[in-house]
Curated annotation (Swiss-Prot):
GO molecular function, one term: RNA binding
Family per similarity comment: Belongs to the tospovirus nucleocapsid protein family.
Entry keyword annotation includes RNA-binding: yes
Top-level division of the source organism's lineage: Viruses
GO CC, alphabetical: helical viral capsid; ribonucleoprotein complex; viral nucleocapsid
Keywords attached to this entry: Capsid protein, Helical capsid protein, Ribonucleoprotein, RNA-binding, Viral nucleoprotein, Virion
Phylogenetic placement of the source organism: Viruses, Riboviria, Orthornavirae, Negarnaviricota, Polyploviricotina
Gene behind this protein: N
Record protein name field: Nucleoprotein
Location(s), subcellular: Virion
Domain remarks: The N-terminus and C-terminus are involved in homooligomerization and play an essential role in viral RNA synthesis.
InterPro entries listed in its UniProt record: Tospo_nucleocap
Amino acid sequence: MSKVKLTKESIVALLTQGKDLEFEEDQNLVAFNFKTFCLENLDQIKKMSIISCLTFLKNRQSIMKVIKQSDFTFGKITIKKTSDRIGATDMTFRRLDSLIRVRLVEETGNSENLNTIKSKIASHPLIQAYGLPLDDAKSVRLAIMLGGSLPLIASVDSFEMISVVLAIYQDAKYKDLGIDPKKYDTREALGKVCTVLKSKAFEMNEDQVKKGKEYAAILSSSNPNAKGSIAMEHYSETLNKFYEMFGVKKQAKLTELA
């Protein structure tokens, strides 16, 4: 019996050779726990201002493309372009993104920071696409979560219900939200969130269900089609003139034609 390190070459040997192989214990895949990762790495982004955190979320896709072009280092952290095996302590773009969202949600506990986040995040395209009303701290927290990795964030204490309710909403409304199931499987994401909750023995007691219903009520009041209606209303005076040319009587509000 031979014990070897888990590498690409040793996996090939495992699959093609007749000799007995075992991987060294410390090389076995370690179960990743984002809650632990979060506690150990939140300090890495403590210098980021709230505005900078919001800038990251607003430009997430563009930032991701740049970071993934090559190994990306900030401070003492490096996000590798390619990795045969991502370890439990390695930083990835998704983990960084989740850290920033957790940081922002925690900042909503301060009224001044809450107002700053509320005013800035309202202009983010994803929030407008969801038609999410930003009336209180809970709605702002939902806004911060939009586009994030719910299975990762669900492992953090106090983030369980907001994650599972948002996952359910996305699964129920994926067509209205314009989510392509071939690119993002909402049911699979919900399953992953539930798996995380089960692994941490999370109990959906009466208090947790009450909290979940509050988040669900906010999401129920959102209007995924509002973005187009708002944009149409902005140009309503001019657009209505063209409607009249097509024999449609001018309305007080263009959105009434929808």
